């Protein structure tokens, strides 16, 4: 199947996806909002008054869920190198996660406070070459973890997307060194054919 045909096939399936249709009706920016809702319903990640950092936030589905969960009194800082339209209760900072200036901008926005939750739904551009895609996904997740360590308070929570494969062992090992508990989550809203899972790490610095 040619790339053009694969794209058309994916678009047809995407439009028919019940989570895509439901997200449009509910006003969510993306179907990914339901993944976070389902993880939070199971694990109770959020609470009113928390400070949340959302890495790779655009178009904003996860930030929408977090903003609703931490109100009243909470903060959601959404970060992405892509532009994102404003959302109620969400502060957006545009920049590259690997840039020192970007990290300084976030710390300034936090004003000396620490984040209660850092979450990342970032994924690389998929090439279709399994090993290469897994390696890029791992690199993104490790960057997100390194960044989280600079802003998380204790006992903080880190939620990150990963892709199943041998390389994931390195990420799990790093998380287990830094957090008290690490769990795998595959929310119902994740597509069946997708190799994505989420790693939920709790108890940072405990």
In which residue ranges do the predicted regions lie?
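A short glycine-rich, Lys/Arg-flanked "PGG" loop and its adjoining helix->strand segment in the class I
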Residues: 67, 138-154
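Glycine/threonine-rich flexible loop motifs
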Residues: 126-137
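S-adenosyl-L-methionine
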Residues: 79-127
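Class I SAM-dependent methyltransferase Rossmann-like catalytic core
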Residues: 1-48
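Class I S-adenosyl-L-methionine
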Residues: 165-206
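Conserved class I S-adenosyl-L-methionine
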Residues: 48-58
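Short glycine-dipeptide loop
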Residues: 72-74, 151-157
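Conserved SAM-binding loop of SAM-dependent methyltransferases across substrates and taxa
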Residues: 59-72
